[in-house]
Design a protein with these regions (language model features):
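Juxtadomain coupling helices with adjacent low-complexity linkers
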Residues: 1-29, 68, 124, 130-177
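Structured interaction and signal-relay segments at domain junctions
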Residues: 2-14, 18-107
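Short coil/loop residues immediately preceding or within conserved phosphate-binding loops
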Residues: 38, 111, 239
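Acidic surface patches and DE-rich sequence motifs
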Residues: 45, 118, 235
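Sensory/regulatory domains in signal-transduction proteins
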Residues: 83-153, 157
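Signal-transducing coiled-coil/dimerization helices and immediately adjacent hinge/linker segments
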Residues: 156-247
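Short, amphipathic alpha-helical interaction segments positioned at domain boundaries
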Residues: 247-253
Length: 253
């Protein structure tokens, strides 16, 4: 195996090792792939969001950004990508117009599409594009290796998000268990008066409106604040500012 090819693999391995510590940047991954393959690189997740991009020619940046909006491609374009179940290399001309429509402006570039699949689940797509000459076998192998890195990272991020959501739910449940029946009732009324995730309340008005005591309302707020569920700030005569930090608190009321 060529020495330079091994060096390119090592660069991608470096990105993967950084990922395990939570430091991966999709932009950095795209930059490295763009550098070693000499092509424009786009990492797109399964929902059509552009996670990262890198360009060999600055003039290409705005063109593709205009067409994709950079942050998200159209649903129809994303569907076309998801229909690609295996690496599709060196697509050009009419085949690109068939995929993305006649208005697509880069039909003169060679495109390679590499699905990112991990654990049998489709997680995204790496799109590569360049002028002048088609992608060779080595470049396609590197792109497929990059797609594996992307799949592992997306899967890791999904797992972290799920764990974070579960931790939020658990925190709310534990905090809820510390409330007395009257404090739970007070919390229900507070949330009714706070339609958004933040706002101002006047404890005395809520107490009078629902037949509660100020002390019960204050106690409920203090317990939830100490549990990290919300934060409060006294506004003096204007009442109390409340900001909900854990959105799952509403699900238990």
């Amino acid at each position: 195996m060529k020495k330079d090819f091994l060096e390119k693999i090592r660069k991608l391995n470096w990105v993967l090792s950084e990922s395990t510590t939570g430091k991966l940047s999709y932009g950095e991954l795209c930059r490295i792939l763009s550098e070693i393959i000499n092509a424009n690189i786009y990492v797109i997740d399964r929902n059509g969001f552009v996670l990262g991009a890198a360009y060999t020619e600055a003039s290409d940046t705005s063109t593709f950004e205009d067409e994709l909006g950079f942050e998200k491609i159209t649903d129809s374009d994303n569907l076309s990508l998801l229909e690609i179940e295996a690496t599709s290399a060196n697509v050009i001309g009419d085949d690109l117009m068939y995929m993305f429509g006649k208005s697509y402006k880069m039909t003169d570039k060679y495109h390679t599409f590499v699905p990112s699949i991990c654990g049998g689940e489709r997680l995204g797509t790496i799109l590569l594009a360049k002028y002048h000459k088609p992608f060779d076998e080595e470049e396609i192998v590197l792109a497929e290796y990059g797609a594996a890195v992307v799949g592992l990272e997306i899967q890791r991020n999904d797992r972290i998000k799920k764990e974070h959501e579960q931790n939020l739910k658990t925190a709310v449940e534990m905090a809820f268990c510390t409330l007395s029946h009257s404090e739970k009732d007070a919390l229900d009324k507070i949330l009714r008066e706070t339609k958004e995730d933040e706002g101002n309340i006047v404890a005395s008005k809520i107490a009078a409106k629902y037949g509660l005591t100020n002390s019960v309302i204050v106690s409920a707020l203090k317990k939830l604040e100490s549990a990290g569920i919300l934060e409060t700030k006294s506004l003096g005569m204007k009442g109390t500012y409340i900001k909900i930090l854990n959105p799952h608190v509403r699900s238990l009321i």
